[in-house]
Amino acid sequence: TRMNTTFDYLFGKKIMKLDKVTASFKENKQVSSGLDFIKDDLYQSITNTSAFKRLDGITFLGAIGLTNKIGKKRDISRAEHSINVASLAYKISTARKYDEELTKHLCIAGLLHDIGHFPLSHSVEGYLSKKLNVDHHALGNLIIDGEFPQLNDLHKILKNKVNIPFIKSLLEKEVGKDLGGDIFSSQFNIDTIDGIYQSGLFIGY
């Protein structure tokens, strides 16, 4: 079926073996400082799902990240990047004095903003999006909604803990600044901030 074919590409039966962060790389994670918030049981449960752990084997820079590093730092995984983005969401929420519930939703949106990425990230997305008629944003929504049984552990957590439509609205950039939506929708958003930082590290800046 189409869903099974999509899952094969998503989970990596076709190309995941080409995109692996080696164990030696994982020993020295380039994640943001100030990550105490991630120790919260809810965030831990999300990062321990098969849906999120899948991102551990996907390089942030895609095919470029599999080459020899140019600068002093290696490429990170999509999982590490997602934790960095969630960290930025937490720091901004704290600075803006958002309440605990809104902060929680912004951080979870940060963790899940790349949950639908294909192996090799943007390097193959153009091809696979045309082949499967779906991009990583739409795939992320399918995973969040529990449409793939193999990755359904994430949805089981979310449906009892958060407002899923609000999380998806944040990721679709449909939420206003009054509820923190600008940290995802502005031109210089938290995803872009960490992306620029990690790319700079990789090339030696």
What do the PLM-derived regions correspond to, one by one?
Residues R2-C107, G116-Y205:
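Sequence-structural signature of the catalytic-core scaffold of metal-dependent phosphohydrolases
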